[in-house]
Amino acid sequence: MGYGCRNKYTGVHLAGSCKQIKTYQVGIQRNIIWVITSFFLISSSFSRNGSLNSSAYFIFLFFNIVTKFIKIESCFLFYAVRKVAN
């Protein structure tokens, strides 16, 4: 008994799947589209007015990707710990 994740808002026990993982997978798909468009912005800013704008894009892109992967990893770790504990 007790496989899956508990929803952190309602405390409802989900059988076999974690809702957080599903929502982050949708977020990754959106991020991939955003990454592609931002790389076009980066390349256009390189060609137009040098490295100042592009470095700002790179910093914003890096922090966005890192925070998404930290959220995904924490959800998987929580799921694995719950499975081992039960």
Curated annotation (Swiss-Prot):
Please name the source species.
Answer: Marchantia polymorpha (Common liverwort)
Tell me the superkingdom of the source: Eukaryota
GO CC, one annotated term: mitochondrion
Subcellular location, record wording: Mitochondrion
Q: What is this protein called?
A: Uncharacterized mitochondrial protein ymf7
Q: Any idea which UniProt keywords this protein has?
A: Mitochondrion
